[in-house]
Amino acid sequence: MGGFNLNEMMAAAKQHAEELQKKMAQTVIEATAGGGSVTVKMNGQKQLLSIKIDPEVVKSGDVEMLQDLVTAAVNEGSRRVDQAMQSNLSGMMGGMGLPGF
């Protein structure tokens, strides 16, 4: 009797989730703000790996602007990680043959 086997589906979902976590841990996203004045890199688990700040921004002495640029770059990086996760998740779920993915 073929058909729906919940245990097999759950095992496959767990395997896909583990694969996705590994893939995202190896993914590195770069995002910028202020026309490249601030650049951040973060991995697919949203861990901040590096921040690069153009020395000219620091020389300006405008701390509030620098804070805003760092915040914007980190938020953009986070948004890009979310997009990468969604894209990878959609691809994996589609491979499982589930409707709607």
Curated annotation (Swiss-Prot):
The keyword DNA-binding applies. InterPro entries: YbaB-like_sf, YbaB/EbfC. One of its GO terms (cellular component) is bacterial nucleoid. Signal peptide: none annotated. Gene3D superfamilies: Nucleoid-associated protein YbaB-like domain (3.30.1310.10). It comes from the Bacteria. GO terms for molecular function: DNA binding. Pfam families: YbaB_DNA_bd (PF02575). Coiled coil: none annotated. The keyword Protease does not apply. Keywords: Cytoplasm, DNA-binding. It is found in: Cytoplasm, Nucleoid. Binds to DNA and alters its conformation. May be involved in regulation of gene expression, nucleoid organization and DNA protection. Belongs to the YbaB/EbfC family. This is Nucleoid-associated protein Acid345_1974. It comes from Koribacter versatilis (strain Ellin345). The lineage of its organism: Bacteria, Pseudomonadati, Acidobacteriota, Terriglobia, Terriglobales.
